[in-house]
Each structure stands twice: as C-alpha cells, then as structure tokens.
Curated annotation (Swiss-Prot):
This is Serine--tRNA ligase. One of its GO terms (molecular function) is ATP binding. GO terms for biological process: selenocysteine biosynthetic process; seryl-tRNA aminoacylation. The keyword Protease does not apply. The keyword NADP does not apply. Its main location: cytoplasm. Pfam families: Seryl_tRNA_N (PF02403), tRNA-synt_2b (PF00587). Pathway: Aminoacyl-tRNA biosynthesis; selenocysteinyl-tRNA(Sec) biosynthesis; L-seryl-tRNA(Sec) from L-serine and tRNA(Sec): step 1/1. It comes from Mannheimia succiniciproducens (strain KCTC 0769BP / MBEL55E). ATP binds at residues 267-269, 354-357. Keywords: Aminoacyl-tRNA synthetase, ATP-binding, Cytoplasm, Ligase, Nucleotide-binding, Protein biosynthesis.
Length: 430
C-alpha cells in the first residue's frame, strides 16, 4: 500500500505516474470526493467529541454543586448517539478509501526503466559461458524420464492432473540436495536464519504481503467448515516469512533481519494457459528456497544488491550460466519498487529463463502489515522496508542442472557442490 499522504497531497502527480509507469488508471474524482467526505466527517467527529467531553465536565461540576444533572445527562446521551452515527459514516468512508488503496500498485523507483513488458527489461550483466555441446542435446523432460527413477509426469497427471510430476530415485535425491545446498549456503555464509513456516495461511496474512485482494484467483483456497476461517496454500514462502513481523515494532539496531525458508509453493497459474505445458518450468506445486530481509528504511536499496548477490552465488557455485535483468515498469510485480530477475541458461530452449526474482518492496508491505522500527535514541517509529528473493526455485534449478550437465549417453554429471549431499555420487545414470 502506498503512502496515503501521497494520495491526499499529490493525487494528480501520483495518478499521472501510475498511468505512465504502471498502466494503472486511478479514479481521481472518486478519491477526491471520498477524501473531502473523510475530512468533513473527521472534523465533525472531533467537534462532537470535544462537546461531549465538555458536557461530561459540566456534569461533574453540576453534581459537585448539588444541581440537577438529568438535563445534562440527556444532552450527553443525545450527543453520544449523534457521535456514534457520524463515526459509523466515517468508518464507512475509511473502508472505501482502504479498499481503493489495496488495489493500487507500488510506485517504481526512479532508476527503474520505463517499458511496457519484458521485452524492455534492461540486461545488467552476464556470468558464465553457455556450454557448447558436440552431440545432440536432450531437454530435461527426455533426460528425466530416462534416468534411473527419474521424473514421472504421467504419474503426476494420474494423481493430480496437469502441471504435476513425481520424482524418484537419484533425481528426487538431487532435487532434495539442491534445496539443502541452498539453505546451507544462505544460513552458513549469508547470515540468514532458517525458518519453518505454515503452508496454509489466513487472509490477513495474504493481505499483508499483497496477494489479496488483487491475486485471489492465482491461489488455491480451502473451503472452510462452518465457523472456521478460510485458508489458502502459500504461493511463496515470502508470504508467511514476511508476515512474521506484522504488527511488530522492531529495534532499528537489530536490523537487518534475514530469514530463509524451503517450502513447496502452490499456484493456480490462472493466467498461464498454454504456456510451458511441458516439463517442470511451470507447475502448480514446486519447491523454492526463499530469502526475506527486513531492513532499516534508509538501507533497502543496498540490501537489494546484497540479496540479489546471494541468489547469484547459488548459480555461480553450481556453475550455471545466467544473466541479471533489471525489470522495466511494465514487467514489475504489483508490490515492488525495484526488481532484478536472474535468468539461467536452458540449453534445450537455447535461451535464458527466469530462476530468481529479487525485489525491494519499499514500505508497501510494511504499511499493510503495520511493521515498524524504532531506534533506542528516538521515540518515533518508522515503517520498515521489506525485500524478498528466490534463492532459488528448486525445480527450475534442477532443470538447468540436468540440461547443462547432461552427457551424450543421457546420463547427468552431478555438480561438485552437490556431491556431499548425494553420498559422493558423481553421475546419475540411466
């Protein structure tokens, strides 16, 4: 949620920025009318409250003098009813303003390039050189289906439907090894605290990080029993991990807080019909190691560079070529003010594919969550800044390893950094 003071004091400017950079049309007339009503009702509420307080003091004084206070009490009672009515009207207007505010995307940072879609993202750097194969390469589906145990897409479809898979044997072991390797790297070298979180969360949590109300159709929702709250399966560990600081006032001196979690993620892929229907690239259920940072609001841009470097380190240690992209305004996530995507080289597709998205959410999520910090030398609180990034998507990393480390006979060499997690295994055979 963007700062409501920006909407109140710079409505036209904010609306113009949202239209230009986010292709978002803000109804300024409706907002201005609601804001006028809010101000009028706020003044009326405060005036009535002051009058009622004055009458309350008058009652006390009259009672002390032994006077009849019945007329004053009746007057106070009338004021109370009037005050309750005005407060109810004010609450209704505030709710309408809040509903609108929840639909407004974050404002991009000044350095984010203007663009309509991913074709206008800016390449920042590349690492590694794509391998030149001297044999006809196979994609991860063909490789996975023919490795020992391997990947069974038919079994996934039988159990659940499209966009599910079953892994067995050494491929399943490599999938687990990748997640363990990522967690160990982030906790032992990058300073993150490993966190285990629920996979089902309530709607308050989803509002906190911005999944609701805009992205409800992308979630898998439970059907609650009578008297129970509805839940949704997490689309990313960002949701529960970031919400750990909801309604908290943190010591600024204790920041940054770095947390990481390995979880399954569940997405309906509502807007992805027909895209990546083959293989592990786009699944309804996939594993991811997520990194979250809660930082001093003056230090979030440097934290974004650090967070992104932590994700890059995973790819570098695995020896996987990748490129770093700065997303343009038209390709950024709803709550982000600046995002880097890391795209790994996928040989069978002869292109780079997203494997990590690292974002600075500024105070957008913190305002929704009321997550604040306060210095020991200053009584004033400030909204923290929140950041998140994939470190990495495990399934897509498996895709990249299988394809980049494949051999002519269909076997796959195990990257050296994974071998300690796989009992010293050097090659996954057929």
């Amino acid at each position: 949620m963007i700062d409501p003071n920006l909407l109140r004091n710079n409505l036209a400017e904010v609306a113009a920025t949202l239209k230009l950079k986010r292709n978002f049309i803000l109804d300024t007339k409706e907002l201005a009318e609601l804001e006028e009503q809010r101000k009028a009702l706020q003044v009326e509420t405060e005036t009535l409250q002051a009058k009622r307080n004055a009458r309350s003091k008058a009652v006390g004084a009259a009672k002390a003098r032994g006077e009849n206070i019945a007329p004053l009490l009746a007057e106070m009672d009338d004021m109370g009813h009037e005050l309750a009515t005005v407060k109810a009207e004010l609450d209704e207007i505030l709710a309408e303003l809040n509903t609108i505010a929840l639909t407004i995307p974050n404002l991009p940072a000044d350095e984010v390039p203007l663009g309509k879609d991913d074709s206008e993202n800016k390449e920042i750097s590349r690492w590694g050189t794509p391998r030149q194969f001297d044999f006809e390469i196979k994609d991860h589906v063909t490789l996975g289906e023919n490795l020992a145990g391997g990947i069974d897409f038919a079994a996934g479809a039988k159990l659940s439907g499209a966009r599910f898979a079953v892994m067995k044997g050494q491929v399943a072991k490599m999938h687990r090894a990748l997640a363990q390797f990522m967690l160990d790297l982030h906790t032992e070298q990058h300073g993150y605290t490993e966190t285990y979180v629920p996979y089902l969360v309530n709607h308050t949590t989803l509002y906190g990080t911005g999944q609701l109300p805009k992205f409800g159709e992308d979630l898998f929702h439970t059907t609650p029993l009578e008297g129970e709250v509805p839940y949704a399966l997490i689309p990313t560990a960002e949701v529960p991990v970031t919400n750990l600081v909801r309604d908290e006032i943190l010591n600024t001196e204790d920041l940054p807080i770095r947390m990481t979690a390995h979880t399954p993620c569940f997405r309906s892929e509502a807007g992805s019909y027909g895209r990546d229907t083959r293989g592990l690239i786009r699944m309804h259920q996939f594993d991811k190691v997520e990194m979250v940072q809660i930082v001093d609001p003056d230090k979030s841009m440097e934290a974004l560079e650090e967070l992104t470097a932590h994700a890059e380190k995973v790819l570098q240690l695995l020896g996987l070529p990748y490129r770093k992209m700065l997303l343009c305004t038209g390709d950024m996530g709803f709550g982000s003010c600046k995002t880097y995507d890391l795209e790994v080289w996928v040989p069978a597709q002869d292109t780079y594919r997203e494997i990590s998205s690292c974002s600075n959410m500024w105070d957008f999520q913190a305002r929704r969550m009321q997550a604040r910090c306060r210095s020991k030398t200053d009584k004033k609180t400030r909204l923290v800044h929140t950041l998140n990034g994939s470190g990495l998507a495990v399934g897509r990393t498996l895709v990249a390893v299988l394809e980049n480390y494949q051999n002519e006979d269909g076997s796959v060499t195990v990257p050296e950094v994974l071998r300690p997690y796989m009992g010293g295994l050097e090659v996954i055979g057929k």
